[in-house]
Amino acid sequence: EEPGHFAARHLLGVVYLERGEYLVMIAGCHDCHTPNFLVNGGKGVEADYLTGGKLGWRGPWGTTYPANLRLYFQKMSEDQWVGVAKEIQRRPPMPFFSLNAMSEGDVRAIYKYIRWLGPAGVAAPSFVPPDKEPPQPYVQFPVQ
C-alpha cells in the first residue's frame, strides 16, 4: 500500500471520530447516558462517557434507565447498528425519532466514536413497570 493511501485512511478515521464525538454532544446523548453530565453543566469524565447510569426516568410508561452505550455497541457490527438506528423505538425520554432521522453517515460516525471509547462500566438497571415503585434516584415526569 502506498503511504498516501494509509494517511488518507487514517485521516478519514479521525474525521469519523471527530464527527461522532460532535454528534454525540449536540444530540444530547451525554445528557442521559453519561453519569452526572447534566448536573455538572455539560461536563463529564471521559472514562465515564456513555456508560449509562442509575438515575431513572419515571412516567406513565414506567421507569427507564439510560443504557450503557459502550457495552451495547460491543454487541453489534457497524452495519447492524445502522439498521437498528433507523428502526429503533424506545420508551421516553429517549428521543429515538431523532436517531431514526439521522443520515447513515452520521449514524456510522456515532458508532465509530463509541466503539473507539471502548467497553466500560456496567449494564443499566432493568426497566421498572408503571405499577412498581423504582429505587431512588429518579426523575418524575408529570402524569398527563
Which sequence ranges carry the predicted segments?
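Short Cys/His-rich Zn2+-coordinating modules
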Residues: 11-15
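Extracytoplasmic/secreted envelope proteins and their assembly/folding machinery
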Residues: 17, 21, 66, 70, ...
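Homeobox/homeodomain signature
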Residues: 19, 59, 66, 84, ...
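Local sequence-structure signature of Cys/Sec-based thiol-disulfide redox active-site neighborhoods
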Residues: 21-27
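Short, cysteine/histidine-rich loop/knuckle motifs that typically chelate Zn2+
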Residues: 31
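A structural feature that tracks compact, well-ordered secondary-structure segments
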Residues: 70-74, 83-88, 96-99, 116
